[in-house]
């Protein structure tokens, strides 16, 4: 079987999204910040919800797995208590 072609740096020719910077500029949270999510803080939670009302994934927000889990629980609890809506009205 013939091996795949590689670039001069040794990476596969097909490329890697992390290497070409496709995902690096979309991060929403700096790694230097201490992240705490309060279900009552509507402004902070809305930063992590897209225009359809979905929670933005980890690969875009730049959160760790633990922080993303805390965010998810806070958003779900805020929706349950009607702090933020389940469905966004602006999306039509």
UniProtKB/Swiss-Prot annotation:
Keywords: Ribonucleoprotein, Ribosomal protein, RNA-binding, rRNA-binding. This is Small ribosomal subunit protein bS18. The gene is rpsR. Transmembrane segments: none annotated. Pfam families: Ribosomal_S18. InterPro entries: Ribosomal_bS18 (IPR001648), Ribosomal_bS18_sf (IPR036870). GO terms for biological process: translation. It comes from Chlorobium chlorochromatii (strain CaD3). One of its GO terms (cellular component) is cytosolic small ribosomal subunit. One of its GO terms (molecular function) is structural constituent of ribosome. Binds as a heterodimer with protein bS6 to the central domain of the 16S rRNA, where it helps stabilize the platform of the 30S subunit. Part of the 30S ribosomal subunit. Forms a tight heterodimer with protein bS6.
